[in-house]
UniProtKB/Swiss-Prot annotation:
GO terms for molecular function: FMN binding; NADH:ubiquinone reductase (non-electrogenic) activity; NADPH dehydrogenase (quinone) activity. It comes from Oryza sativa subsp. japonica (Rice). It holds the Pfam family FMN_red. It catalyses: a quinone + NADH + H(+) = a quinol + NAD(+); a quinone + NADPH + H(+) = a quinol + NADP(+). Its EC number is 1.6.5.2. InterPro entries: Flavoprotein-like_sf (IPR029039), FMN_Rdtase-like_dom (IPR005025), NAD(P)H-dep_reductase (IPR050712). Homotetramer. This is Probable NADPH:quinone oxidoreductase 1. Belongs to the SsuE family. Its cofactor is FMN. GO terms for cellular component: cytosol. The enzyme apparently serves as a quinone reductase in connection with conjugation reactions of hydroquinones involved in detoxification pathways. Keywords: Flavoprotein, FMN, NAD, NADP, Oxidoreductase.
């Protein structure tokens, strides 16, 4: 009997739109990395830091189409990823500035996001960041990102019982299970799109 073919390892670039150290959205992404290590073979979540990116300014681009070193390094990580998991906080009903800045830098010149799958998780007040998710999906249309539709995860972070500890780490087991379902959907969708290539 032949051994089953090994599943390819799918590299998930996890990008948090909040730069705050104890960000709840960062906590969701850390939990996602832990869930993958514990229970989802073939899926690896790598955090991609966007805090060092300069604000988008095309004057920083070189005459031959080059970018500042921090931007080049970020674009390389985006290109190397098989798919993306965005932790998208909601600021004033929309996407946080650091995340929009990262999206814009990696779309300059050759669009590094194009034709790759993605998922969004968010945490916050009100709708749990849900409105930022819809704006991110709208931006993704132009970037040719392919978002999973379901399941959605928007955590109402300030409702009781507490969902996060004082360091922003997820402590809610039910939300952790919901993150797992998002990741399984992203994994299946990524494999499906890769088979079409």
């Amino acid at each position: 009997m032949e051994a089953a073919a090994a599943r390819p390892v799918i590299r998930v670039a996890a990008i948090c739109g909040s730069l705050r150290k104890a960000s709840y959205n960062g906590g969701l992404l850390r939990a996602a990395a832990g869930v993958c290590e514990e229970s989802i073979p073939g899926l690896r979540v790598d955090h991609v830091d966007i805090s060092g990116l300069p604000l988008l300014n095309t004057d920083l681009e070189t005459a031959d189409g080059g970018f500042p070193p921090a931007v080049e390094a970020f674009r390389d990580k985006v290109r190397q990823a098989d798919c993306f998991l965005f932790g998208s906080p909601e600021y004033n009903y929309s996407i946080a500035t650091p995340l929009k800045n990262a999206l814009d830098w990696a779309s300059r010149g050759q669009n590094c996001w194009a034709d790759k799958p993605a998922a969004i998780v968010s945490a916050g007040g009100g709708f749990g960041g849900g409105r930022s998710q819809y704006h991110l999906r709208q931006v993704g249309v132009f970037l040719d990102l392919h978002f999973i539709n379901k399941p959605e995860l928007a955590v109402k972070a300030f409702e009781q019982p507490p969902k996060f500890d004082s360091d922003g780490n997820l402590i809610d087991a039910q939300i952790r299970e919901r993150i797992k379902q998002v990741l399984l959907s992203l994994q299946a969708f990524t494999l499906r799109l890769q088979k079409k290539d």
